[in-house]
């Protein structure tokens, strides 16, 4: 049977960065792997960030969101059936930061997937400097992603103070309590950033498995507040985009923006990757890109956001 891992993490937590490290570790062990990008929106930016992993022993597949729950589940199941015929040793599923974890377990119990795949690990990435106050819906997503995790990695731990790390762990456990989950997290948490993880750390992660935990479910239609907005072919410089994103993330009239990501060309015509969260905004060179900016958050106001990006 093919081992399959789920790697979750709330918006902007650093899942894709961790997956690059984890995939390289698996490739160094001689494994043949497939990575399935399962995004919330209709455009998948993270696929471009993983392109350098592609090779004889690593293939990338994609499911775009932007559809209803049943359609998305059907696409996920169909893609896993196709990948089950490719001879992989391991499949890594990276969903969006807004994901119903139950879908993963439910689909893998369907025939014929229950005979082809064995769940390996559920790994959750959490920002070590997690916002102290989130909405009820956001806390639910945080709890639902952590509840079944065999290991939890604190991204950006090297940038966080000891107090911030402890506050993040307290927040995780508080979110679990709010959904009536009995689990409390401590030993499962690796207080290291992905860049600091050693081979021995990855050996532990590879064997961490998952936990079948119960908690009070919130129906997806109760989370209508989560949105993703797409802005294509913007006529804006890289420097100006970074400035405008910083302003709109501080403007409550735009809604609650969790994450902004995408690509833009600089003055020399080279691609730059934008990645913005509540903690930082970065603009880094990248080999290839797509002229798109994606804004993800709660109850977003498109007209207000568009003014920042297009005027």
Which residue ranges define each predicted feature?
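Short, Lys/Arg-enriched, disordered terminal segments
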Residues: 1-2, 311
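Nucleotide-state-sensitive switch-loop elements of NTP-binding domains
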Residues: 2-13, 17-135
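Short, hydrophobic beta-strand segments that form beta-sheet elements in well-ordered domains
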Residues: 34-36, 261-264, 295
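Flexible glycine-/small-residue-rich
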Residues: 37, 126, 276-278, 297
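Conserved C-terminal guanine-recognition region of P-loop GTPase G domains, centered on the G4
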Residues: 83, 98-183
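C-terminal accessory "lid"/substrate-recognition subdomains
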Residues: 148-154, 159-287, 299-302, 310
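C-terminal engagement modules used by replication, chromatin/transcription, nuclear envelope/ESCRT
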Residues: 288-296
């Amino acid at each position: 049977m093919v081992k399959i891992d789920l790697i979750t993490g709330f918006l902007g937590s650093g899942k894709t960065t961790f997956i690059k490290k984890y995939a390289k570790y698996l490739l160094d062990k001689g494994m043949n792997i497939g990575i399935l990008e399962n995004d919330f929106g209709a455009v998948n930016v993270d696929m471009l960030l993983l392109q350098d992993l592609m090779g004889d022993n690593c293939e990338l597949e994609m499911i775009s969101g932007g559809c209803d729950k049943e359609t998305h589940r059907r696409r996920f199941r169909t893609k896993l059936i196709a990948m089950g015929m490719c001879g992989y040793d391991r499949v890594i599923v990276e969903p969006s930061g807004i994901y119903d974890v139950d879908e993963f377990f439910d689909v893998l119990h369907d025939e014929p997937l229950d005979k082809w795949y064995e769940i390996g690990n559920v790994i959750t990435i959490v920002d070590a400097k997690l916002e102290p106050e989130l909405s009820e819906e956001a806390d639910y997503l945080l709890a639902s992603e952590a509840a079944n995790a065999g290991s939890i990695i604190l991204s950006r731990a090297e940038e966080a103070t000891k107090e911030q790390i402890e506050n993040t762990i307290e927040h995780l456990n508080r979110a679990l309590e709010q959904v009536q989950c009995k689990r409390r997290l401590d030993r499962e948490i690796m207080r290291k950033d992905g860049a600091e993880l050693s081979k021995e750390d990855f050996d532990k992660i590879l064997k961490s498995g998952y936990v079948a935990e119960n908690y009070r479910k919130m129906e997806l239609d109760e989370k209508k507040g989560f949105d993703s907005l797409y802005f294509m072919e913007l006529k804006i410089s890289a420097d100006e985009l970074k400035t405008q994103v910083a302003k709109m993330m501080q403007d409550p009239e735009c809604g609650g923006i969790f994450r902004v990501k995408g690509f833009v060309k600089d003055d020399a015509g080279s691609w730059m990757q934008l990645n913005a969260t509540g903690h930082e905004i970065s603009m880094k060179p990248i080999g290839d890109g797509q002229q798109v900016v994606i804004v993800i958050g709660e109850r977003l106001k498109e007209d207000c956001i568009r003014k920042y990006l297009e005027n």
